[in-house]
């Protein structure tokens, strides 16, 4: 296994036909490449307890959630993962959110879904390209 510092976390969701990125204010965090046969990564985020309801709603949906993380340095390009919330733990005034998932190629999977949603909303041409780039 390889362990790295988690320096940035964004949750990417579709809300009211729009793709929304929510920046999560990290207190601390780790990201672990489990190097298993399934190419699984563990993302552990320590955040303020005021995020509890936000993460509970996501967890209760029992759906996969796309996230972007910055690994080791805030200046690094974000890596995109498809994850699910494994657990949420109370730690004093904070919560520890454990996500399990797989790193994805930005040209595939959920990104294609995001592009399809934009096309369905009527975006086309340069406006589509601009909107799509703003989401990446």
Roles of regions detected by a PLM:
Residues 18-23, 43, 95-102:
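Short, well-ordered strand-loop elements centered on a beta-strand within folded domains, enriched
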Residues 84-107:
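Short peripheral tails and domain-boundary helices/loops at the edges of structured domains
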Residues 1-38:
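N-terminal "first-domain core" detector
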Residues 103-136:
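Mixed-charge, glycine-accented linear interaction segment located at domain edges/termini
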Residues 32-80:
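Compact, well-ordered interaction domains used in eukaryotic information-processing assemblies
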Residues 52-54, 76, 92, 106-110:
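Intrinsically disordered, low-complexity acidic/polar segments
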Residues 57-61, 79-86, 100, 114:
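"Short basic amphipathic alpha-helical interaction patches in structured regions
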């Amino acid at each position: 296994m390889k362990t790295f510092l988690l320096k940035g976390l964004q949750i990417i969701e579709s809300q009211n036909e729009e793709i929304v990125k929510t920046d999560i204010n990290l207190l601390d965090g780790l990201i672990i490449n489990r190097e298993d046969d399934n190419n699984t990564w563990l993302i552990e985020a320590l955040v303020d307890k005021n995020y509890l309801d936000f993460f509970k709603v996501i967890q209760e949906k029992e759906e996969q959630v796309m996230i972007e993380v910055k690994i080791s340095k805030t200046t690094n390009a974000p890596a995109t993962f498809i994850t699910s919330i494994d657990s949420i733990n109370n730690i004093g005034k904070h919560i520890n959110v454990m996500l399990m998932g797989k790193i994805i190629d930005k040209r595939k999977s959920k990104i294609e879904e995001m592009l399809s949603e934009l096309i369905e909303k009527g975006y086309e041409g340069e406006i589509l390209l601009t909107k799509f780039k703003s989401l990446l």
